[in-house]
């Protein structure tokens, strides 16, 4: 019988392989990963959740993914991700960087776990945050424009179901 740690590593390895193969098949040459310094420090999500969450080896996860991507010719970049979960991507809210220098009101909010409500639409909160991380990266590289925004809004408004089989 496999240990839980080995089983988790096997699932992660298969997930990485699937992700890297998908990126290659779609001709994606840059993977943007959000980072937030000290994000696992001093969290307060309950004693049991703190123990479970802070035990997840995200640094190891990120390094392994970066290694496999770079092996496949995909550049991996890290993007500071403060305020990406609070800002509405669909409403094109500005995204301040940490520490926030001015008061900004955001047009949307998390309505419940996993959902973000903008002015007119509801979107998965993780998708909203991910799109904002990408937006921050593109803005910092002077590559953000209205065409990219409208394309991404169209893509995230028509989700696809992906099934991954683990043998």
Regions found by a protein language model. Give the residues of each.
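Positively charged, helix-rich recognition surfaces that bind polyanionic ligands
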Residues: 1-167
